[in-house]
Amino acid sequence: MNKGKFIVLSGPSGVGKGTIVANLLASLPIHYSISMTTRSPREGERNGVNYYFVTKDEFEKQIKQGNLLEYATYNNNYYGTPKDKIEEKLNENISVISEIEVKGAKQIKKIYPEAILIFIAPPSVEELKNRLIGRGTETIDQINERISIAEEELKVATLYDYIIVNDYLKYATDKVINIKKNS
């Protein structure tokens, strides 16, 4: 029986993962696995579309009930991948894409060794900082914390199957499309 491909995108906050995923969903027949988080929604984000936004208590309940494929904390918030739909879609030969932070991606690879892990990297840490400032959603202290986390994430990027530098959005999106088609 054929199975769909499980593609995991990771990378620092502000690198463009969400935009790449949106472009992929517009270009490919692929299912987006919506992550669950305890962080507050950013402007324009909607519950059940961008993330499932839940309280810390609700997230911890999901952990206890075994409803998450993986979970981790990032920047003092929980992030996790609900199990439902992923296996169902893969068994229907429908590929799944998920946007997961580095710790979670490692957990996914243990459960799904055939998963394709793609790390989206910024052209430079300075450019990443400029992007985060340009978003206008965080204080300078929060941005500096995200940069510190990004520097740690960049150190483990070599553990991924592919690394794509997002210095030109169309190029980065096309690279992910080609990886999906050729894997």
Stretches found by the model and what they are:
Residues 37-96, 103:
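ATP-dependent small-molecule kinase phosphotransfer cores
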Residues 114, 130, 134-138, 152-183:
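NTP-dependent small-molecule kinase module
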Residues 12:
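P-loop (Walker A) phosphate-binding loop of NTP-binding proteins
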